[in-house]
């Protein structure tokens, strides 16, 4: 456990990198503009270089290339300053471990397995035949229904809900208001009404998955909806039934993924994206915020953007410029048409 105050040499001993200048003590990470002498900050983007000169930060995390411009400052030189900053921030943000015990108002149904190392909060509910791993934290008013399986050190924040039969891997974190395993939107038209299709699958989340507040991941119609290891999903995201999401993909807020969509690994999906159902998105695809994805993306590594029609980011950026010039172009077109008409009249 690193102390609340630590020196630059202690940080580099834990995380690597090279410290330069004085081996000062720091107490927290702060932005360049707010940092004081007891803080460490970082420069990840060269366009903010001027802020370093004005910053009162006691130490700054920089790349080797940027370090040459800051002689006389206390530095930590790292290959990736932004990643290094994240790791330093983690050092100063203690991970809350489970305090073993079950609150008197919690309900643990017969047949549930709850190790002594787990923390079960006030009014939490653990269903029958559910198995919790070591060190889980099921906080106030959270619900884990029957026949679920949770790995070690899973955290359910207050009012999170995991429906029956779902599986969560190790170190999964579900934030408040999220619902894992509610019924998928499966309906068959019966001529004059809709007949609900029973959703008999479940949801499987891999290890190190994080689900934001008020996000919904629907259970599969017949097979499980799956989210791979290390994937992070923001607040207020809807994942439809039967979706398969690969490992280490990130999905930003307000995105809606329709049913039976397959998303690869290491994808980046911006906020407010919408997809049609039953399509595939290749590994390492980047989708810009607000994009409407209307067909499969089969080539890995593509950067896609645009509300409609979907296109590559390069094509979308070019077309966006044209959209802003449509009025001007229309006037020019009318002028040219008039000139052409006048020319014909004089012939």
UniProtKB/Swiss-Prot annotation:
Keyword terms of this UniProt record: Acyltransferase, Lipid A biosynthesis, Lipid biosynthesis, Lipid metabolism, Repeat, Transferase
Gene3D superfamilies per record: 1.20.5.170, Hexapeptide repeat proteins, MurE/MurF, N-terminal domain
Catalytic site: 241
The name this protein goes by in its record: UDP-3-O-acylglucosamine N-acyltransferase
Subunit text: Homotrimer.
Pathway assignment: Bacterial outer membrane biogenesis; LPS lipid A biosynthesis
GO biological process: lipid A biosynthetic process
Signal peptide as annotated in the record: none
Catalyzed reaction equations: a UDP-3-O-[(3R)-3-hydroxyacyl]-alpha-D-glucosamine + a (3R)-hydroxyacyl-[ACP] = a UDP-2-N,3-O-bis[(3R)-3-hydroxyacyl]-alpha-D-glucosamine + holo-[ACP] + H(+)
HAMAP family assigned to the protein according to its UniProt record, in alphabetical order: LpxD
Gene Ontology CC terms: membrane
Record EC number: 2.3.1.191
Keyword set includes Acyltransferase: yes
UniProt similarity note: Belongs to the transferase hexapeptide repeat family. LpxD subfamily.
Chain's role: Catalyzes the N-acylation of UDP-3-O-acylglucosamine using 3-hydroxyacyl-ACP as the acyl donor. Is involved in the biosynthesis of lipid A, a phosphorylated glycolipid that anchors the lipopolysaccharide to the outer membrane of the cell.
Classification via InterPro entries: Hexapep, Hexapep_transf_CS, LpxD, Trimer_LpxA-like_sf, UDP_GlcNAc_AcTrfase_non-rep
GO molecular function, one term: N-acyltransferase activity
């Amino acid at each position: 456990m690193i102390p609340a105050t630590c020196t630059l040499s202690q940080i580099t001993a834990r995380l690597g990198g090279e410290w330069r200048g004085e081996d000062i003590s720091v107490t927290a990470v702060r932005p360049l503009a707010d940092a004081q002498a007891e803080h460490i900050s970082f420069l990840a983007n060269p366009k903010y270089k001027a802020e370093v000169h004005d910053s009162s930060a006691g130490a700054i995390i920089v790349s080797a290339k940027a370090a040459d411009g800051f002689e006389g400052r206390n530095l930590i030189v790292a290959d990736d300053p932004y990643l290094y900053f994240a790791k330093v921030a983690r050092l100063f943000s203690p991970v809350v471990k489970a305090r073993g015990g079950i609150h008197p108002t919690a309900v643990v149904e017969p047949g549930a397995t709850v190790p002594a190392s787990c923390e079960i909060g006030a009014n939490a509910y653990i269903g029958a035949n559910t198995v919790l791993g070591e060190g889980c934290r099921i906080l106030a008013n959270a619900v884990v229904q029957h026949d679920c399986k949770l790995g070690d050190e899973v955290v359910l924040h207050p009012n999170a809900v995991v429906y029956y039969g779902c599986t969560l891997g190790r170190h999964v974190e579900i934030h408040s208001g999220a619902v894992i395993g509610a019924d998928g939107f499966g309906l068959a038209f019966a001529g004059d009404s809709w007949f609900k299709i029973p959703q008999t699958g479940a949801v499987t989340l891999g290890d190190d998955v994080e689900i934001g507040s008020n996000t919904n991941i629907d259970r599969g119609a017949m097979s499980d909806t799956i989210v791979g290891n290390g994937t992070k999903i923001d607040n207020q995201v809807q994942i439809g039934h039967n979706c398969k999401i690969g490992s280490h993909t990130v999905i930003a807020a307000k995105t809606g993924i329709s049913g039976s969509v397959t998303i690869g690994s290491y994808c980046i999906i911006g906020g407010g994206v919408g997809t049609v159902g039953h399509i595939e998105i290749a590994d390492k695809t980047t989708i810009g915020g607000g994009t409407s994805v209307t067909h499969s993306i089969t080539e890995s590594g593509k950067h896609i953007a645009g509300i409609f029609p979907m296109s590559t980011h390069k094509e979308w950026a070019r077309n966006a410029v044209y959209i802003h010039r449509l009025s001007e172009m229309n006037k020019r077109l009318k002028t040219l048409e008039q000139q052409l008409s006048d020319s014909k009249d004089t012939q």
